[in-house]
Regions:
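Acidic/histidine-rich catalytic cores of soluble enzymes
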Residues: 1-85
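Short helix-capping segments at alpha-helix termini
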Residues: 13-18, 89-92, 122-124
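C-terminal helical cap(s) of enzyme catalytic domains, especially alpha/beta-barrels
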Residues: 107-124
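Active-site clefts of carbohydrate-active enzymes
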Residues: 59-73, 92-107
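Residue-level detector of solvent-exposed, low-hydrophobicity positions
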Residues: 32-37, 74, 87, 99-102, ...
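Short basic/hydrophobic patches in alpha-helices and adjacent helix-turn junctions
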Residues: 61, 82-90, 102, 120
């Protein structure tokens, strides 16, 4: 599901309203170091912004995955406002799940920061 173009073609062929995608902001790694499946660094990535744009046409859900924040509450590994504007521009009105996969042992501050950033961008 990391190759949005391929997944979009699958969705077109399925062509059923009850079949959709879960657009995950952090799921665009095409190949990892040593061809590992998980855990190894990503060495080839599908363009995140293009992928989100392509998959939003089929979105039944969105997973706002984050990894790191600066002192001002901005996600530092990707352009969250740009992504959320893609989601909004697609007319999505469903649920946005919150995920945090940062290095901290306690994920709750990261999830709270993610939620706050979503609210800041989408409400303002």
């Amino acid at each position: 599901s990391s190759d949005a173009q391929l997944l979009s073609k699958v969705m077109e062929r399925v062509g059923m309203d009850n079949c959709g995608t879960l657009v995950d902001f952090g799921n665009f790694c095409l190949r990892r170091e040593n061809d590992e499946r998980w855990g190894a660094p990503c060495v080839e990535e599908y363009d995140r912004y293009q992928g989100i744009e392509e998959l939003m046409a089929y979105a039944h859900g969105v997973s706002a995955k984050s990894y790191a924040f600066d002192a001002e509450g901005n996600e530092t590994t990707m352009d969250f406002p740009r992504i959320l504007n893609i989601v909004r521009g697609a007319g999505f009105s469903g649920f946005i799940g919150v995920e945090f996969e940062g290095p901290d042992a306690d994920p709750f501050p990261g999830m709270e920061a993610t939620k706050a950033l979503i609210e800041t961008v989408l409400i303002n």
